[in-house]
Amino acid sequence: MLKTLSCTALLVATFACSAAEPTPDQAPTLTVLSSGGIMGAIRNVAPAYEHTYGVKLNVLAAPSMGQTPQAIPNRLQRGEPADVVLMVGSALDKLVTDGKADKASRIDLGKSFIAMAVRKGEPKPAIGTMGELRQVLLDSPSVAYSDSASGVYLSKTLFPSMNLGEGFTHKAHMIPAEPVGKVVARGQAAIGFQQLSELKPVAGIDIVGLIPAEGQKMTMYSGAVVANSQHRAAAQALLDYMASAQADAAIEKSGLNPLPHSAH
């Protein structure tokens, strides 16, 4: 009788220990909502991070702002499950204020700058000065820009300040929910403007370069844990990794400028 009870107890203890040990199937899957400007960085980080830490990353494209249903604020407003958001810092601040993202977890990850692209094989015009950029804008038959941070700045601030004339407004178009580079690659716009990190992954275009410093606007890309995340510790660990020196190469390769780590 005692032998039977001992065996039973041993089996129960063994089962309990086995159940407590994590298995590959139990590895958490983090849903990451990423805007285009930092998408290249998280895509570059993902393979090594998943292999090293056993965490699966489900990365979904989602603009930082705009009317499209896929935009991060609209997804969270609908209650879509997510763990991490990677997006334009100013747009993230509003999510923090609205209680959709955790303030304590918010961290800046990289700086981005606006660049111009043409269809692959087309001549690359000079845009090194504001005068050259203005002439290119006047001469181009069609101009495309995004509906996110860079496009809002271009359409509301830079272009109006350049005295481009009424005709310019008829040939300049804001592109929603699609990378500007793809529109240029299809030949639907002669030139396109977007964050360098958003243009770099697009096939079928040539990047002319950054617009001049006098007309440039830096955009900070940041990240935070979603307020209702079910994997808060794992989500925070991913953000800590992306803000560390280990991720610098991946961030720089994507077209963003990594931040000094003394500032973190």
Where do the PLM segments sit?
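Exported/periplasmic ABC-transporter solute-binding proteins
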Residues: 20-70, 74-81, 90, 94-98, ...
